Amino acid sequence: MKTKITLFALLTLTTSAVYAEDVSKYQEESRAVAMPFLKNLAAENKKAVEEGGPGSAIKVCTEIAPKMAGDISRQNGWKLTRVSLKVRNPLLGTPDAWEQKNLQEFEARVAKGEKVETMEVAEIVQEPAGKSFRFMKAIALQSGCVACHGNAEQIPDNVKAKLSEEYPHDKATGYGVGQIRGAVSIKRPI
C-alpha cells in the first residue's frame, strides 16, 4: 500500500512538472505570435490615421486585422482572435466563457493597480473536443485609439457616422487611455 501511495505521489509530481513545462513553452510560443500581431496592428492603425485621418483606421479593424488574424491562424493551426467585454463586431469579437472569465479577471487586476501591459493568462484546459492550450494577452487602449473607442465627445462626427454604419450594435466606446480594450486570444489544440 505504501508503495502505491509513493508511486501515485511520484506520478502526480512528474505530471505537474511536465504540465508546468508545457504551459511555459506554449506560453512563450503564443507570446511570440501575439506580440508581433499587436505591433503590426498598431503600425497599420498609425499608417491609416496618418494617411486619411481617424476614420481611416476603421478599415484596419474591419478588414486588415481579421485578415492578419486569419493568416496567423492558418499558418500555425491555432485560432487567434481579438475579444472584448464591450464588443464592436459580435461576429469576431465576442468572448467565449473562458475568455470572458479572464477578461473579467483582468479588470479586477487593473482595479488592484496592476499594469494592463503586463497582463496575460495561459493554461491547458479540457474541452469537449479535447485538450487545448489557451492564452490571452490584454490590450491597453492607446492615445491614438480614443478617436474610435473614447467617450462620445472624443469621437469625431464622421467617425461616429462610419462606426454606426459598419457596426450598428457597437458597444466598444467609452474607454480611456490605458484601460483594457480587450485581449488577443489564442487557442491551440494539444
Regions found by a protein language model. Name each.
Residues 10-12:
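Short, linear, compositionally biased motifs with a strong N-terminal bias
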